[in-house]
């Protein structure tokens, strides 16, 4: 398969690039793409930048330039579910915006003319969860659930509670997954998001867990994505 992987931040991109074999860098339309292989799959990686617009542009450039069979959004996210622990991974069953409102004729989070949520193909969710069953598994636990996205770095309990008021089933919150999912929906390209939990706002104060994650725990967090790719 040909797999496109999109991350937002340079810290995430630096870790992901180490997973590639035979890598090389290409420059397209002001963006760098790194190509290589993982588990026999052709892989294209891109750092899109933070937020919905950057990630949508990145997804269009990825799809238009490389025509991947699957697009993966990966990176860190806040845990919406208080049962989650830092370094555990949430794989999307569906993505939705937590900051969109288009009137009473739409569900909260729905863009007019688009689905209320953007579902991940179940076969990819099942493959992701199967990593948990590896003999001698040393990867962080993978859970499946709803990922909500918006233009907000959630660093307070109050903001997290306001999101959960609308989306009580949310498991993780980020700034890119749903915009990439919407782009992939329009371009009819399968999509899945892997989000490594860097902090759980309802168990945190002023994002201290987030900063501790990058200082102490980030190394190796993206190995789960590699294990998933090796199953495709």
Question: What kind of feature is each model-predicted range?
Answer:
Residues 1-60, 65-66:
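N-terminal short beta-loop-beta anion/metal-coordinating cradle
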Residues 43-48, 146-148, 194:
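Active-site-proximal beta-strand elements of phosphoester/diester hydrolases
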Residues 61-65, 83-84, 181-190:
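Alpha-helix C-terminal capping segments
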Residues 67-72:
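Proline-aspartate-enriched helix->loop->beta-strand connector
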Residues 80-167:
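Mid-sequence, gly/pro-rich, charge-dense loop/helix-turn segments that line enzyme active sites
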Residues 152-202, 206:
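A C-terminal functional module that forms or caps the active site or interfaces directly
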Residues 201-232:
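His/Asp/Glu-rich mid-to-C-terminal helical/loop segments that flank catalytic regions of hydrolases
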